[in-house]
């Protein structure tokens, strides 16, 4: 289950990083109740917890649904994540988002499990579009010479690399855009 979840949601752009966990039993060794999405196996299926948090402001996740079959579990996670992505503020963790959401976990449960807003199919379709179009950006960087040239060739060398050019902006340096790079190299 954990591998399926990881593969399904990899590369998902969200207001803040998303942490997930799957525990195979109620001993909860993977600490699923401290994650944004936590899944715990039961004798009848899966329990789904959401909006947990560790770190500076720890918060136990809230139980969203119990004894779910795998298909329903994935549908609820799809809906939850897409609803969070659509409605959360930039850099807002799921735990803070839930605290600020009028109606709290009951509202989320109504939207995700009972489809109270009538957007469940749309949220699932949005997630499926993400899954279907996922492309590993690092693999693309390695396989595309133009992108690969943007990375430093020798990490343990002080020798200059003509592929890496910086320009000054507001008292700091930043990587040059392609047209700026050409101008800098021509003037050097």
Task: For every predicted segment, state its role.
Residues 1-188:
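Peripheral terminal and linker regions in Fe-S/redox and tRNA-modifying enzymes
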């Amino acid at each position: 289950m954990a591998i399926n979840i990881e593969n399904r949601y990899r590369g998902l752009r969200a207001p803040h990083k998303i942490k997930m966990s799957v525990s195979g039993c109620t001993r909860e060794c993977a600490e699923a109740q401290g994650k944004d999405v936590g899944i715990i196996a039961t004798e009848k299926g899966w329990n789904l917890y959401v909006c947990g948090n560790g770190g500076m402001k720890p918060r136990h996740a809230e139980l969203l649904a119990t004894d779910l079959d795998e298909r329903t579990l994935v549908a609820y996670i799809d809906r939850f994540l897409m609803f969070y992505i659509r409605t959360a503020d930039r850099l807002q963790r799921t735990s803070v988002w839930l605290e600020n959401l009028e109606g709290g976990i009951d509202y989320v449960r109504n939207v995700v499990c009972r489809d109270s807003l009538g957007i469940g199919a749309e949220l699932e379709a949005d997630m499926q579009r993400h899954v279907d179009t996922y492309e590993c950006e690092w693999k693309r960087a390695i396989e595309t010479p133009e992108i690969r040239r943007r990375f430093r060739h020798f990490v343990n060398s002080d020798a200059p690399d003509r592929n890496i050019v910086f320009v000054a902006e507001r008292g700091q340096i930043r990587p040059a855009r392609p047209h700026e790079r050409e101008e800098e190299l021509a003037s050097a």
